[in-house]
Structures are given as C-alpha cells and as structure tokens.
Amino acid sequence: MRINGHSHLLPYPEEIPAFMKEKEIFWIDEDRKFMLQKNWKRPVTDSSFFLHEKLEWMAKNHIDHAVVLNLSQLYGNGLRMEEMKQVLRWQNDFNAKVQADHPDKFTCGFVIHAGFVRSALWEIERCVEELDLRVLCLPTHYLDSTGTWRTIFDPETEPIFELANHYGLAVEIHPYDGEKFIQLENTAWRFHLVWMLAQCADSYHFFTLNGYHERYPNMRTCF
C-alpha cells in the first residue's frame, strides 16, 4: 500500500462559512486560484488540493491512502475565543465528513487550541468519540490567553497530552505563524525553509526535556 503521510485538502469556495470570509479569517477565491486571509494570500498550485481532483490525482499516481492534516492557516491563533471555536469546529467537521465519506482513502486530523485547555479537552472528546478522528494536529507554538507565544509542550498543556495518551492518538506537530513572533521580514520563503525547522527543533527540545515521550507512551508523536 502506498500512503501519502502528509496531505492537505482545501474546501471548495462554497463550503466555507460566510462569516469566515466576511471577517477575513480564511477563504478561497471563486476561481480556486488563491487561498486568502487578511493581508495574506497564497496561490493554489494544483487542483488536487480539492477533494474530487485529489481522488483523481491519487488514482493516477497509484496512491492508496492519504493522511489529511489540518490547514495551518486555521490553528486559531489571534482569533477571539468564540470565532476560534467556530472555525476549529467547522474544520474538524469538514475533515470528519471527508473521512466518513471516503474511509478507504483518507485518515483525517483534527485541531484544538491549546490556549483554552478546558474547551480543547471537550473538542478532543467530541472528535474522537463522535467523529472517529484519531490524528490530533497541533502547532509548534500557540498564543496563550495573555497574548504570549508558548511552545506547545508546556506544563499548561499537559492535560491535552494526558487525554491524547488515554485515547492512543497520533499527534502531528506542525510549524506555522513564525512571522508573528520572529521579527524578520517575510521574504525568500525564509519562514518555510529555515524558521519552520527551527520551530520544530524548539518544540522537540521541550518535548524531550520534559520527558513527554516517556510520560505519554501511548501518544505517537511526529514533527
């Protein structure tokens, strides 16, 4: 079996809730050429980022299964709490539907915001027990309720990892938002080519320093 272990899936423009475009949180243009946020846009480089086209692309390239991770643009950092909860819940429901409709083709991830631990635990329980999602996607760093950037592996977030360990989840740690707390000009893809590696290294440093690989042996973690 050939498995794509790091895949992303974009919603079609009409699948994105209107409030997300109205508030410039995230949207796709009608021609499916760009994904956009306030003061940011990135080209959609291939039609296979969308569901039906991805299925065709997988068949053409003899890929049997794909692990679909959450969109990095929708980790919720910097959003108000109610907006963040709506965005994350929508994304998790979207991924759950993809997995439910195509269980032989996709294993999909879900996301929570580590800055609000209690609501994060509720969402983990919902995604695992109601939606049958088993891959928890987390950023290397998150913005806490005081406006401070913290590594995801922090004493404040330990209840999240305790629950992930209880459920035996796969946990995928993905770098993003580096330009929001690393004070350098965003040019020459430096945040993708250099600083994302540094973010992973920083996160991994605290993962091992705090002994989480030993404390949570049922939690399978990748960076």
Question: Locations of the language-model features?
Answer:
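Helix-coil boundary/capping segments in enzymes
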Residues: 1-223
